[in-house]
Each structure stands twice: as C-alpha cells, then as structure tokens.
C-alpha cells in the first residue's frame, strides 16, 4: 500500500451535525479535540472541518436537510433520524476517569460510567466510558490498563 498523506490516517470518520460550528467548539471544549482545519461555504456554513486528538482525526460537516443530497446520499446526524446511531467513535485517552469527569462537566451525557473491560490474560484490559454528545453521536473513550 502507498503511504497516506502526512497528518492523515488510513481511515478517517466524518460526523454530520445540524449545528456543526457549535459542535466543533463543544467537541474541543468537552472532549479535548483540537481544530486543525475549517473550510466555510459561501453562506458561512461548515463545509469541512478536521479535528485532531493526538494522532487521531475526525472530520465534521454540516447537515443539509433541505438540499439535494451530495453524491446522491443524504447525510444526517442522529438528532435528524430519531436519535439512531449507526456507528460509534472510539478514542484512546490517557486517563479515562479524568476525561469522563471533564466531559460530564462540559455537558456530555454519560451513558456508561468508567469501567474496566478485561478480555483475558492473552489479550488486554481497558478502562472505558461511553458518552453522547449534544447532537446524539455516541463516543467511547478508553485507556489501556493491561496488555499491548
């Protein structure tokens, strides 16, 4: 395989939000992401955004509810489809308990408190928690506590 471009991962998820601009700020404040790139459309809407967390990245885009779907596929966030999630984002953090408390204080809905998930001696153990952001995307934050 060819190497990926600098500062990119081989897989990069894109999250769609009704109010992408507000969620960019919220994701940075609550979950610790950093804004790397923001591209605005003619009307000031978020066309493309790259948020990083360590070596990881997610892209953020604005919903276009009334517009003709780009590429023939409508893109909607969970709030626009009755809260349904078709994916979760998992992020490794240094301290899952501290990260959880920071996210909770910033308004994240914690759906699973930090807990160790042990997959056996031949595998690993992680301390993880689950959170939902204000527009309904599900996130998992994990800290490796044993194993590779």
Predicted segment positions?
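Vicinal oxygen chelate
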Residues: 1-14, 24-25, 31-132, 142-148
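Short, surface-exposed ligand-recognition loops at beta-strand->loop->(often short) alpha-helix junctions
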Residues: 16-19
